[in-house]
Amino acid sequence: MNCLFCKIIAGDIPSAKVYEDELVYAFRDIAPQAPTHILVVPKAHIESCNGVTAENSAVVAHIFEVIPQIAKAEGLETGYRVVSNCGDDAGQTVHHLHFHILGGKKLALEMA
């Protein structure tokens, strides 16, 4: 297993966990881009958004049920951003589908 996030989920690499259930693992980013920066990943290895299929899309729907719970627990009542990079040109550095929750300050309108 060479996937960094698979190793984190397995407990082989430590992380600052903020949420876990049978399908999803969420932890604080080690290089935060905002005061609150959490990564939410499916436990099943899916390489990117391009790997979402009819067979595994339920986990993505579940992630979007979990994200508001995490945001509320983190005190992000005034807003937060959810981002997923897909592919090298988009800035995806770990090839395991993940969603960034960014918040804790007023975020810039520019996305790129």
Regions found by a protein language model. Name each.
Residues 1-112:
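HIT superfamily nucleotide-processing domains
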